[in-house]
Structure formats: C-alpha cells, structure tokens
Amino acid sequence: MEQQYRTYDFELAGRKLTLEFGKMAKQAHGSVLVRYGDTAILSAVTVSKEPKPLDFFPLTVNYEERLYAVGKIPGGFIKREGRPSEKAILASRLIDRPVRPLFAEGFRNDVQIVNTVLSVDQDCSPEIAAMIGTSAALCVSEIPFEGPIAGVIVGRIDGEFVINPTVAQAEKSDIHLTVAGTHKAINMVEAAANQVPEAIMLEAIMAGHDVIKQLVEFQNMIVSEIGKQKMEVILHEVDPEIDQAVRAYAEARLKEAVRIEEKQARYDAIDDIKAETKEHFAAKDAEAYPEQEKMISEVLGNIVKDEVRRLITDEKVRPDGRALNEIRPLSSETTILSRTHGSAMFTRGQTQALSVCTLGALGDVQILDGLGLEESKRFMHHYNFPPYSVGEARPLRPPGRREIGHGALGERAIEPIIPSEVEFPYTIRLVSEVIESNGSTSQASICASVLALMDAGVPIKAPVAGIAMGLIMSKDEKSFSILTDIQGMEDHLGDMDFKVAGTEAGVTAIQMDIKISGINREILELALEQARVGRLHILNHMMSTISEPRKELSPYAPKIMTMTINPEKIRDVIGPQGRVINKIIEETGVKIDIEQDGRVFIASINHEANLRAKQIIEDLVREVAVGQVYLGTVKRVEKYGAFIELFAGKEGLCHISQLAEERVAKTEDVVAVGDKVQVKVTEIDDQGRVNLSRKAVLKEQAAAEQAAETPTKAE
C-alpha cells in the first residue's frame, strides 16, 4: 500500500526541522524529504531482495551535491556535476560511520543510501540533515536497522556550548564537533578544535548526545506511526559442524601463531596454517570443499580474532608483546630530501610516513567550487597509501574515500597551528606518503607533517602529534580494555578506532569509528586521558628531533615580498586585459597576487627579481604631482610636441611651445626618441592627461644661475 503523505516537525537549535514522508521517491523502500531551515535533503534507501555471497556487509552511502542547491551552474565545458567533491566524500563517510554498526552481523543484502542535496541554507548543515534523513528513512522502511541514530554539530563560544552553530557563530567557535549516536550511546565523533583540553571536549560530546537523545525519541515516535514491518532476512551463519571441525584441526596452532611479536612473521605463520588447513579439508572432501571454502576461511579468521581479543581482555597481552598503554618504538628525522622546501620521516614501530612541505605564492591556493561559502584553501594536507606499504602488488588508483578522509583528518589536526596569512603569506601544501604500514598511518602522517613544517621554516604556533586508541569489549560487555597506539591487527579485530591529535595544551582533532552499537562516557573519558599521555610522549620525541621551526626558508622556496597600494590603483597595475601585470611577470619572472584591499604579494626564488617587480609596481602607482620636476624619457615625437615617460606607466605631453624658451619650428630640432630631459608638470586635466613644460625648467635654471652670479650687498 502506498504511504500517505505525513509531516513531522521538531525544533532543532532554534530552527525548524521537518520530515516529510510519502511525498518523494515513493518507490524506494524508505524515503524522506528533510527540511532544516531552507536546507532540503532527499534521503532514499533501498535493499536487495536476496543476500549476496560475500564475507562483508555491502552497504554504500552516497551524498550527492547539486550546484543548483546554491544557485550555481557548474563550470567547464560539460556544465554538469562531475565526480563527487572532497566535501561530498567526507559527508558520505560521516553518515556511513554511525549507521554501519547498527545492521545485524551476518546481514549480507545490498543496502544503498542516497542523500541528494536539493537546497542549502548555510546556517543549517546539509550533512546533519542528511544524517537524520538517512536514519529516518531506514527506520520507517522494511530494512532491518537497529536505529534510530541522530547527529548534531557542537560549537563553543565564550565557554558556552552551541548546538548546530550558524556560519557567524562557527567563526567565533573554538570547537567544531560532529557527534552521532543512539539513545543509549555515542557511536561516531568527528572534531576539529583550537587546542581545547580533553575535559572540555568530553563535555562537548555529552552536550551533543543530550540533543541526540531527543532526536532519537522524535524518530521513534514517527516509526510507531508509519514504520513498516521489517523484512525477514537470512543472516549468514557458519555451519556448526564445519566450525567444530576447523577449530579441532587448526585452533591450537593459530593461537600459538598469534603470539609471534613481529608482524610479518606472525602474518606468514597464520597464512601458512590457513593454507594448510584448506588443503586438508579439500583433500578430505573434494566434492563438498568448494561450498565450504568461505566458511572454513571465516572460521579461521574467527579463531584469530577470538584469541587476540582473549589475550588482551584476559591476559592483558597484545600481539606484539606490548603493555596496553605502551607506544611502539619511535624514530624521526628531518631534511630527508635536499631540494624540497621541507621534509621529514616519522616511524612508529612498523608504521612509517614520509611528509613533504611545499611553499607557494598565495595564487597557488586551491579554488573550491562547491556548496559552501569557502572559495579557496590556503593550507592543504594530502595522504597517499601505496600498495608496497603493506607488501602488496596491486594496481595504483586515484585517492579513494579512505585516503581523502585521512588527508582531511590530518588537515584538521594541523590547521589550528598554521600561521595567519598576514604573518606568513604563503600557500602551504603537505603530502604524506605512507611508506610502511602496520596501523595508525593517519596519525604518523600528522607527526611527520608537523616535522616537515618545522623543517621548512614555517612558524607554527605549537607542534602537534597524533595517536590512535583502540577498544576491546568483553563478550558480556561488562569489562573493556583501552589500547594505546593500535597496530593493524588490533584495528581490524578491535571494537574502536579512536584517533586524537593535539598539542601540549589541548586537542586539535578527533575521529572515532566503532564497530559496536556505541560507547559511554566512562570509555570516552579514559580513552581521551590515555591518548593525552601518549600524545605528550610522542611530542617529547618530536621535539628532540627538531625543537623549533628553522629560522630561514629553504633556498629553493619562493621569497615573498609584500607591499600595499591604493585599491583604486589596482587597475593600473593589471592594465587592460592584464597586459601590464603580464608584462611585469614576463620581464621579472615573478608571481604577483593582488588582493582587493590593495595588498600585493610578489613571489620568486630570486630576491633581486622581487625588488625589480616591486619597483615597477611602485612606479605604476606613483602619483604625478603638479609643480614637480621629473627626469623623463622621450617616447614619441609628434609635430605638436613630445610624449615623455616620467616613470613606468606614466607619460605626459610636452607641447612644442613648451620645449624651449625660443620658438621651435620642429619638435625634432630639440628632442629625439630616447633622450633624457627634465620637465615640469604644469597641469593634470579633468581626463587625467598630464601636461609638461621643458621651458619652465629652463627658465628656473637660468634664474638660479643668474642669482648665483649676482653679488650680494655685503660683497
């Protein structure tokens, strides 16, 4: 039966939130039009009828930006939206992370979530509207989802928390925290902060959760009225006989292999046991083996997972032998690469990141063409994860969602310590190459990038370090273990990946992903404190490598010279169709960027070229003063007079009658092109034309000479 049109209202942070059902996308299994202020999002969810023969849950979350939502037409020749923007990818991840843990384990049906941005009110976050819409659409559909969930943004202004701050409020806030969760627990955190203490970050998270509870109750009320009966699904389960047989054959040996401390040796031993076990069962029953292979692989994986978790929770022993709060051995060095502007390598156990800092002119900023107000980005951090970092051979592809997400996390962590444009007028790009990986690569890239900034001579406000925390819950969920500096196996087999970056003074970024339904305040508080202790340990190590930014930039970095001109003179520097500024660039080899307020930035590796360009610009904007005498150059000779250049870009006419004291028959009799002559500015007319006189200068010179020759009365 077709769903009837229903609307439900909720006041969220002083603005109206409306969920409209039965109006759009009625053939989807669940859909809702979310209106938050003037923001409008269509959230639609669908599910396949049959499960897929996969060993993972095939969930896809899409966040589709449409430029018509902000009244823009896409640029380029095609004039339509292309691949998702970086912001759209991050929004998809933001929605995916709190939703994914709330599907039943063993659910293998395809689930697709599509959020289409139809209209954007900059003061009402479309990401938050899409997150709420996703949850509501799933909850009213027949898809088995253990929600609802909700999310909010938390800011802090003058010590007070603000829910879903407006653009104006966000500019004053020292926290930008997105938190999501269920009525009982928090299951996703994404934060940027300006060196905020852990205790305040915790309170901000809990303040957000208080509003989330209300939004969840609001959705529960909707579900009670219009929710569909959930579909019956076949959850993937392992045949108990296969489980018992595989455990009897391989469990003891796998448990021994898990205790091998060195990563590659441990993985090799586990892989050998798995391969030998599969060969055993293939030989034992060749006919049935093809159907049993996936289950056998799953049981082998479960044995490893169960043993790793048991060792941590019961024996407090980690796969590599570390204590629960112990950080792997650290090493770092700077100036790895001679010709780059700044470089550093940071190693933590078997995780290694090489970061390179490049400084550019302000014209090198990234131009953004999206749904937000931000038009350009002066600081960038990019993250690359090549296959050789984990000893694999696979095709190289453009950065995926993971790489973009890790790059953005590093960018958020480091941005609060980047000097202002006034203090350091450069565009800054950091690139982190993960050259060896055993977990926590995003945090290693943050550490390496900060070292590279200091190596490049960027006057950062304070060094930042990052660390990844893990969580292992007991089967009864009555006890838990928090791990410091998790490695790959602990990340893969654990319940939480909790990344925290910051300075000695406080937090600059947080990212939390979990695989269970949620965590409480106690776990958050302990994880934040344990991360703080670990972060300070890493910062001490980093400071022993380089204690402060270098005093001088690399000789290969551009030197930037700043000057200020009258904004009304900008057009004189640029010239018609940019001819003047392009000529300066061509002659000197510099880069020139001009701001609307009259600030001019000149960049070049060659300091002398900067000075030359600056002199030309100063000449272009110099004001011609009536009564002033200039030494000019004759540029053009006409019957009626000579055009004389006073300085770059400024010419005046010396009429033939003003060339000499006596009458002049021909201009050429007095001056020729290229001659240097002294002239006086006699007039600037209403059209800005400059009239000059050589005659006036000659008269003044003659009068001065006569005065010098005439004896005084005293003589």
From Swiss-Prot:
Main location, first listed in the record: cytoplasm
Positions with a binding annotation for Mg(2+): D491, D497
Catalysed reactions, semicolon-separated: RNA(n+1) + phosphate = RNA(n) + a ribonucleoside 5'-diphosphate
Gene Ontology terms describing biological process: mRNA catabolic process; RNA processing
SMART domains in UniProt: KH, S1
Alphabetized CDD domains for the sequence: KH-I_PNPase (cd02393), RNase_PH_PNPase_1 (cd11363), RNase_PH_PNPase_2 (cd11364), S1_PNPase (cd04472)
This protein's UniProt keywords: Cytoplasm, Magnesium, Metal-binding, Nucleotidyltransferase, RNA-binding, Transferase
Enzyme Commission code(s) on record: 2.7.7.8
Compartments in which it is found: Cytoplasm
One GO CC annotation: cytosol
Pfam families: KH_1, PNPase, RNase_PH, RNase_PH_C, S1
Molecular function terms from GO: 3'-5'-RNA exonuclease activity; magnesium ion binding; polyribonucleotide nucleotidyltransferase activity; RNA binding
Recorded family membership: Belongs to the polyribonucleotide nucleotidyltransferase family.
Protein name as it appears in the record: Polyribonucleotide nucleotidyltransferase
Organism: Brevibacillus brevis (strain 47 / JCM 6285 / NBRC 100599)
